Amino acid sequence: MLEFQELTVKEGARLRPYYETCDYRLCEYSLGVKLMWRDYLPPWFAEAAGCLIIRNCIEGQYVFDYPILGPEGDAGAALTAIEQYCGDKELPLVLSVVPEDKASQLVLRYPRVTVISERPWKDYLYHTEDLAQFAGRRYSGQRNHINKFRRDYPDAAFVALTDPNDPRLTAFWTDYEAEFHKTGPLAKQELALAQEMFSLLDTGWFCAGGMLAEGRLVAVSLAEKCGGTLVNHIEKALYSHAGAYPAIVQAFAACY
């Protein structure tokens, strides 16, 4: 039977290779989401049939990610292991956030199954070149904001961030918190989690960068490469610097 253990930062190096090659194009299939939101999921993991199996707990119910294949992974055998686990524990079998191309396979595997599409929770997917160029009428608003930002801060430049102890990052969080006026507990916790993620820069699991203007960081971003998709976990910019948000989006896409 599957033996699950809690997914923590300590297990990151062990699990990151699964996510590094995972091409499901869903943010839930990333190490960053599992770490950043571990208090809400919370994720536990097991390995079977060459696959990573994640068990989350959503609103008190155990739900499973679709198996993430390793080099010799067998998704069918991993699903069988999940089925046996649920049978032994007398749990309903619930697969959550299933990749679209896997859903039809599951319908064939399970004759009596309910499929639910949660539209509000769907991810936004962009072509890299669209964000790197912001070309065409669709992105005219973003271009206008970036042009204003460039006029206001002609010295602005994108820099890669790799050191969690970079003093420029420390200064950015101080500046950001000074402009941060959200009082809700979730907003405050999200900010704390974002800072925690940047503390993991030296692990090599994530890529990060920032926009420098007038000698200081005015925007930062952190993402994770999962297969052919760059999963953007964090974007923060100083509200006082209009256009910094689309500027960091464009520069980040062009760099990574």
Where are these regions (language model features)?
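Conserved donor-binding loop and adjoining core beta-sheet/short helix segment
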Residues: 17, 28-101, 212-239
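Conserved GNAT-fold acetyl-CoA-binding loop/helix
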Residues: 24-29, 181-195
